[in-house]
Amino acid sequence: MCLSDKFFSTFVLSFAFLICLLPGTLYAAHGVSLDGTLKYPAGFDHFDYVEPVAKKGGLLTLHALGSFDKMNPFTLKGTEAFGLFGIENSLIFETLAVGSLDEPFAAYGLLAKDIELAEDKKSVLFTLNENARFSDGTPVTVEDVKFSLDTLKSDLAHPSYQMYYQDISEAKIEDKAQGKIRFLFSRPNRELHIIALQMPVLNKKFYTEHGFGSESTADPLLPPVGSGPYIVKEVN
């Protein structure tokens, strides 16, 4: 196809102008850290402190003080069951990235396989792992991620989430087919992209069907759908 010099010049200038309007990328990587250095390379199999050929199967009994009356750990009312989601025990729900116990202030992609921090540090773009699945077999999508942020920042969730994510102004789906979603920040903060990575991802279909928090009409002990390594088989 032939293009006139005039058209080609106009196209190049227009394209260059468009590029200037898009957020510049500070870096794109499989993980992030506050100082910009990572211990583990892209494609690493396991953390050094993990036994990669650990025996599978058997029975593990864990204990916790007190009782529980709900299976949703993200609401204020009630007491959730131990191990659903937490800093040390996230057996049911997963986050966009996971921290390394032998490396301070670093996180590696879990549900997200690629992390791109904008040059102005006012947004971060996540590309989801196409192999990520919930326990019901459905894929983890950008719609689930957006639903999670919107829900956790709403009055339906525990107030601590509103405070923690207050500087994340919006989750914007950029490419549904490619699994790309951008978190926009209200102000530059060197820790915000790490904070965003710590957000648990909820199953939109499950909580739309059964409700969330005060809007839920389901049994509070209904086993949840998560993407973590374990499922809740039954509640006694």
Provide a role label for each language-model segment.
Residues 1-8:
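N-terminal secretory signal peptides that target proteins for export/translocation
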Residues 56, 118-121, 173-180:
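A short, structured loop/turn motif at beta-sheet edges
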Residues 117-132:
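Periplasmic solute-binding protein
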Residues 66-70, 131-133, 152-155, 188-191:
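Solvent-exposed loop/turn segments at secondary-structure junctions
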Residues 29-119, 150, 211, 222-233:
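N-terminal lobe/hinge region of extracytoplasmic solute-binding protein
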Residues 2, 127, 162-210, 229-234:
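Surface-exposed binding/hinge segments that line
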Residues 11-24:
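Bacterial N-terminal signal peptides
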